[in-house]
Amino acid sequence: LSGANQLSANPTLRRTNRIRTIHGSLAIEQNTLTLEQVTAVLNGKQVLAPPKDIAEVKNAYEIYDRLEELDPYSVDDLLTAHGIMTRGLVDEAGMFRSKPVGVVDQEGHVLHFGTLPQYVPDLVMELLNWVKNSDVHMLIRSCVFHYEFELIHPFADGNGRVGRLWHTLLLSKWNPAFAWLPVESIIHDRQEAYY
């Protein structure tokens, strides 16, 4: 982490890591674009790919680029981040979900039911308050946040992407180097253990 100054002084390295971050986070969610295609999209080049996958890349880049502006303890900023991350992709972009949801595996087996929608806003606020006020080290708090956030499953879609973004945000407020470390690509490389 002492290399944070090197990262902040090297825009090429920062951009490369940001692209790896976005590719890793989206690949976890079945986005089909390769690292090279993600790079091409962000360089304004035409890529032959599903429009949804291209939109996910552009949306993710926009919100990761605004990371420094976000307050990690603000429900409004969390909703704004979700709105940008899922803009044009889901009906309830930037809003907590209004219906029950569950996570299913490839065979259709339910792995997890999300919190009932009427409890989501209060649980998210409670979680953010805990992260803000806890004396537990931020490395642990950010992991607990990510785990609990995914259990609550506050959105109809985009929970994983926003959870990983927020995990990075929390860590980057503790140590700015985390804004540029491609943690999401590490998670992607260890995806089975992640779930």
Predicted regions and their residues:
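FIC/Doc superfamily catalytic core
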Residues: 1-195
